[in-house]
Amino acid sequence: HIILENTAQQFLIQQRSDSKESRPGQWDITAGAVDAGETSLIGALREAKEEVGLTVPSRAVRFLFRDQRPHCFHDIYYACFPFSLKECTMQASEVQALRLVSDQELIALMQQQCHRTSFYKTQLTNFLENRSKFIASCLQ
C-alpha cells in the first residue's frame, strides 16, 4: 500500500473498478500484491505506476508500518511529491475514478472500511494527524 500526497497536501484515492471481485466500486488508496521476487517497496511503486500512472520518486517514499495478518502482511508506505490529477492515467481493469482528498477525508474513509484492522486504522490516523515533519521535507 502506498499513500500518495501532493505538495498541495491532497491525497490521491482511487475507486476500484466495478469488475473487481474484491470490494468493487470502493474508494481506497493505491495497493496491490507484490510479484515474485519483489520487495514490498518495489511492489508499491509498481502498483502506483500501473494503477494511476504515477512514477513515484524513491527519495519521496517513507515506510510507515506493517499490518500483520494471520496469513499475510501489508507494508504501508507514504510518498509526498508534486503531482496533479491531470498527470494520472487510470488502469481501466483496476480503477474507475480518481479523487484528491484532504487528510481528514482520508481518515474518515479509512475508518469506514470494515476490511481494515483496528491497528491499521490507528496507525494511519496517528500518522496523518502528526505528519508535519514529512510535509516539511516534501515541500522543500
Show where each model-derived region lies.
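Conserved N-terminal beta-strand and adjoining loop/helix that marks the start
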Residues: 1-11
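Histidine- and/or cysteine-centered catalytic micro-motif in compact active-site loops
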Residues: 7, 16-18, 32, 66
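The catalytic Nudix box helix
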Residues: 13, 29-62
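Short, solvent-exposed aromatic-acidic interface loops
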Residues: 16-20, 94-97
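A basic- and aromatic-enriched beta-loop-alpha substructure that forms the phosphate/nucleotide-
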Residues: 18-28
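Recognition helices and adjacent regulatory flanks at domain boundaries
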Residues: 20, 46-50, 77
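Nudix hydrolase/Nudix homology domain
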Residues: 25, 63-140
